[in-house]
Amino acid sequence: MSKLMTRTSGSSSPNTIPDQIESPTSSRSVTQTTNGSHQFVIQGYSLAKGIGVGKHIASDNFSVGGYQWTIFVYPDGKNPEDNSSYVSVFIVLASECTEVRALFELSLVDQSGKGKHKVHSHFNRSLDGGPYTLKYRGSMWGYKRFFRRSLLETSDYLKDDCLKINCTVGVVVSEMHCPRLLSIHVPDSELGSHFGKLLDTLQGSDVTFDVAGEKFQAHKLVLAARSQFFRSMFYNTLAENNSDVVISDLEPKVFKALLHFMYKDSLPGDVEPLTAHSFDLLRPSEIDDTLIVKLLAAAEMYNLSRLRLLCESHICKGISISSVSKILALSDKYNASELKSVSLKFTAENLAAVLQTKAYEDLKDDCPNLQSELLKAVAGYDDTSSSGGGKSQSVWAQLSNGGETSSRRVRQRTT
């Protein structure tokens, strides 16, 4: 903490202004860490063994402190000279940057329930040299001799051929606090809640919608402010005085959800989750009949881009190996570009497994136009994840025959 005090002085003559002391000021530099954690599960450890010394399996990227990170696990060790009998584990900086200072923790999870995890940590202990500094993308911190392989394979850390590694990153950040002598707290905006009350009370409503015989009241100004469609409906010369509107292309429950969004800028609470299990159970026609998908279609119909994104984000949570082909077909049908992009990326990263699913066979028959988009996504993924090349040579054959290939992909990357 640094403090500055200034003093002005003058003559002690009775005719001069007395000495004045300005109020002291202060500032405070606070250095702390922004922490985040990621769990990396390696399912099929026995299949990952034998990939070779210096070759690793990588986790998905995760974000902490504004930087991207990933975990590298070397089942056969990182270097042949001194640690080929060990499993090596490293945390890797995946962002382009100049310099990052951070603390790290790597934990091998005890899966027996005894809580005897193997922990290597910078946190809560004195560091002679301070936090670790990573200076460029690809810089890493970790242990070449993280665990002796022979001991690991007979330990409680390996269960059902599965390893779980927890990683915590603490990015060091510094802030300067200069408190003001006077301040007034301004609460968060209540605009959204006030508009929501308009919908709940219907006070001042000036338009009534008839949706399949069910009546809904609303406010023209609110709807016009939120949607170009309704702005044109209410404020062109032909329809300005029309206070009774028939909606023939939506069901009442969908229109009610649409109004909820228009007033409250969120999805209603009764929108059912579409989990991976839900997609497995439902046929495409049944998926189309869910409220969230009908709301997605309404967003496209009424050109509500934010509602479309909310629906896409909601559906995205159900992406899995078994469901991604159905979600790809859905995104193509309803012009959900963000959902399609995420689905294509997921498929590219898990290609071999997705090609074996029944849903992918249906996708080939129902949406043949997606084949070329999927090929581009897979080729792009291989370009970024492999330095050796040649991976995409048989991709088109795999996509065409539904995945009849002897290759197996465990999401390995070769350094």
Swiss-Prot record:
It is found in: Nucleus; Cytoplasm. GO terms for biological process: cellular response to salt stress; protein ubiquitination; response to osmotic stress. Ubiquitous. Residues 205-271 form the BTB domain. Residues 392-405 have a biased composition (Polar residues). Pfam families: BACK_BPM_SPOP, BTB, MATH_2. Residues 35-169 form the MATH domain. GO terms for cellular component: cytosol; nucleus. SMART domains: BTB, MATH. SUPFAM superfamilies: POZ domain, TRAF domain-like. InterPro entries: BACK_BPM_SPOP, BPM1-6, BPM_C, BTB/POZ_dom, MATH/TRAF_dom, SKP1/BTB/POZ_sf, TRAF-like. Signal peptide: none annotated. Pathway: Protein modification; protein ubiquitination. Keywords: Cytoplasm, Nucleus, Ubl conjugation pathway. May act as a substrate-specific adapter of an E3 ubiquitin-protein ligase complex (CUL3-RBX1-BTB) which mediates the ubiquitination and subsequent proteasomal degradation of target proteins. Heterodimer with BPM1. Interacts with RAP2-4. Interacts with CUL3A. Binds to MYB56 at the promoter of FLOWERING LOCUS T (FT). The BTB/POZ domain mediates the interaction with some component of ubiquitin ligase complexes. Belongs to the Tdpoz family. This is BTB/POZ and MATH domain-containing protein 6. It comes from Arabidopsis thaliana.
